[in-house]
């Protein structure tokens, strides 16, 4: 469980996060959306203990985040960063095993080896287990990185997974694969928090959506309550039309005018 209570974060006079509160329960996927500069990445850094709030409290599994030592935190909290480039070569299975490093001292045990095998099967990367990571496509690399962070918290009761724009730069197929895996983890009891740029993906896959604007929470709740034309206009300064998908029971967003109708390009 994640509990955020009235957090603020400032750098000098600049207020990056202002009075944000929310909860994420085990089994929920929270999507954080907002325009560029809204404070999404800053908020995620606060949740990951990369930076500390200026004011307010963050609780992970009912314990103040500042009381956790990093080695303890690493056993049940995993983070998929936005950029995952490697300057050295690793086999895919070696990289996934890195997710188990917090759980052993010298060498992996049988449980670690089995977890890596299971996670690679679940994420569909077994076929290139012995490939050099740097020879993979962007979508394949992202699946490997997701497998690594899943392996890190695999089997941990109420594990926490933070994803920073996991679909960035991927084609439609890989975007759906990544978010389907994230959705599956939430269904198994994990708390999943993801920054997303695609409002429709947020609406389709998330249990809850939070919209940020200039570091402030302007909406939080289930997609059908949060993904409204009014909220989208306030956050992104664009007029949209909403359609309700009968199969998935979620709103879908389409810009109400083409770019050529809204903006004159010279």
Feature map (PLM): residue ranges:
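Conserved structural motif at the start of ABC-family nucleotide-binding domains
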Residues: 2-4, 17-18
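Helix-to-loop junction immediately C-terminal to a conserved catalytic motif
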Residues: 48
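Conserved ABC transporter NBD signature motif
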Residues: 56-64
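Conserved ABC ATPase "signature" region
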Residues: 111-128, 150
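Conserved ABC ATPase signature
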Residues: 132-136, 140
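Catalytic Walker B motif of ABC-type/P-loop ATPase nucleotide-binding domains
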Residues: 161-165
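ABC ATPase nucleotide-binding domains
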Residues: 235-266
């Amino acid at each position: 469980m994640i509990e955020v209570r009235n957090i603020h974060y400032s750098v000098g006079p600049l207020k990056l996060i202002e009075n944000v509160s929310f909860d994420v329960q085990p089994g929920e996927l929270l999507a954080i959306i907002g325009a560029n500069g809204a404070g999404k990445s800053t908020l995620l850094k606060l949740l990951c203990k990369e930076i500390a709030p200026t004011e307010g409290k963050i609780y992970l599994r009912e314990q103040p985040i500042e009381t956790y030592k990093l080695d303890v935190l690493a056993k049940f909290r995993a983070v998929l960063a936005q950029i995952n480039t490697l300057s050295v070569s690793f086999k895919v299975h070696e990289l996934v095993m890195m997710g188990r490093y917090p759980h052993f001292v010298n060498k992996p045990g049988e449980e670690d080896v089995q977890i890596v095998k299971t996670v690679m099967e679940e994420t569909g990367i077994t076929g290139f287990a012995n490939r050099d990571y740097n020879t993979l496509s962007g979508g394949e690399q992202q699946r490997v990185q997701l497998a690594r962070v899943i392996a890190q918290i695999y089997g941990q009761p109420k594990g926490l997974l933070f994803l920073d724009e996991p679909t960035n730069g991927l084609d439609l197929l890989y975007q759906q694969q990544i978010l389907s895996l994230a959705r599956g983890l939430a269904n198994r009891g994990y708390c999943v928090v993801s920054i997303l740029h695609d409002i429709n993906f947020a609406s389709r896959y998330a249990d809850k959506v939070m919209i940020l604007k200039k570091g402030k929470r302007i909406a939080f709740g289930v997609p059908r309550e949060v993904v409204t034309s009014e909220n989208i206009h306030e956050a992104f300064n664009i007029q949209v039309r909403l359609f309700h998908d009968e199969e998935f029971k979620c709103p879908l967003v389409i810009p109400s005018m083409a770019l050529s109708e809204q903006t004159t390009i010279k």
